[in-house]
Amino acid sequence: MEAFARSERSFEEVMRFYLEMRWMMSNQYTMKIYPAGSGRDVYRNIEICCNSTLNQLCQIILESFDFIDEHMYEFCMDNRMYSEYAYQSDPEGDEPSADITLDEVGLCKGQKFALHYDFMDDWMFTITVSKISEVQGDLKPCIVKAKGSIQQYPD
């Protein structure tokens, strides 16, 4: 009977360890970003953690294309500018804010949405969630692959 009690304790310890490890796991999104009008010659692949916000996603996208972050933007979940299904960088009233985590948005593999940046120049970036992986801890956003370039302010 004593051996059985020890094995139960051992099972409980294993389960507690497993649950603690699961608690420390989080989703990491791999995304492919294309600027509109550039075809398939210009894109970026980025990885970003589920606890990052849409604001942080915008920052890494702009950084990856060497853009200066100095304008308002919105994430268009239906790929249309000024849509009611958008998260705003500077919301008015009860509009949804881009200060929401990626997990709260509820992204899924294969989902496409857009970043509309600079409402005067109307930069559009198509974002595709290409992969969702489980990782341990929160990783910083990073640029995994870059192809081609564009200029924010062409001559």
For every predicted segment, state its role.
Residues 1-155:
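Short linear regulatory motifs enriched in tryptophan with gly/pro/ser
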